[in-house]
């Protein structure tokens, strides 16, 4: 066996469909393009989304909302999620290590949702008034 004698397995590569080569082939004369019209011509195509001059769907439907790029760098943390953090101090780094917030987050805010079950020290995070009261009631403290 040599490289120049390698052949694909029989039947694994079907022959290309040769159009316009006689009526007996089933693709002769019009070559599968039908009669007349834009699509029968060479270069005959329409842009994606083109609806023949009618106002296309993409332009008929109103624009709605947007995705804030600030949301990618900010996060909200529930009080109940503070229990998942190991250790007594909670800051941006420990929240990331616990898998509570994403890597790209730069600022986080603790909101009053759920309960804190142990005393924790919150450092460098924004805290709502209700969350601050709950943390202090559990014996913890909030540091700027």
Curated annotation (Swiss-Prot):
What are the record's GO terms for cellular component? Answer: cytosolic large ribosomal subunit
Comp. bias intervals (Gly residues): 21-31
Signal sequence, renumbered to the chain: none
Example GO molecular function term? Answer: rRNA binding
Region Disordered, as annotated, extends over 1-60
The domain of life for this entry's organism is: Bacteria
Set out the biological process GO terms recorded for this chain's protein.
translation
Its keywords, alphabetically, are:
Ribonucleoprotein, Ribosomal protein, RNA-binding, rRNA-binding
Q: Which InterPro entries match?
A: Ribosomal_uL15, Ribosomal_uL15/eL18, Ribosomal_uL15/eL18_sf, Ribosomal_uL15_bac-type, Ribosomal_uL15_CS
Per UniProt, subunit arrangement is:
Part of the 50S ribosomal subunit.
Query: What does the function comment of this entry state?
Result: Binds to the 23S rRNA.
Q: Which family does it belong to?
A: Belongs to the universal ribosomal protein uL15 family.
What's the protein name? Large ribosomal subunit protein uL15
**Organism field:** Alkalilimnicola ehrlichii (strain ATCC BAA-1101 / DSM 17681 / MLHE-1)
């Amino acid at each position: 066996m040599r490289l120049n004698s390698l052949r694909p397995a029989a039947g694994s590569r079907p022959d290309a469909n040769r159009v316009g080569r006689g009526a007996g082939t089933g693709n002769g004369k019009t070559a599968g393009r039908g009669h007349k019209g834009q699509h029968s011509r060479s270069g005959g195509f329409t842009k994606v989304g083109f609806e023949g001059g009618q106002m296309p769907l993409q332009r008929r439907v109103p624009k709605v909302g947007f995705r804030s790029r600030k949301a990618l760098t900010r996060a909200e943390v529930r009080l109940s999620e503070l229990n998942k953090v190991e250790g007594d101090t909670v800051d941006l780094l420990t929240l990331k290590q616990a898998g509570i917030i994403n890597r790209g987050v730069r600022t986080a805010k603790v909101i009053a949702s759920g309960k804190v079950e142990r005393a924790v020290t919150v450092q460098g995070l924004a805290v709502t008034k209700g969350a601050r009261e709950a943390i202090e009631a559990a014996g913890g403290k909030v540091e700027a």
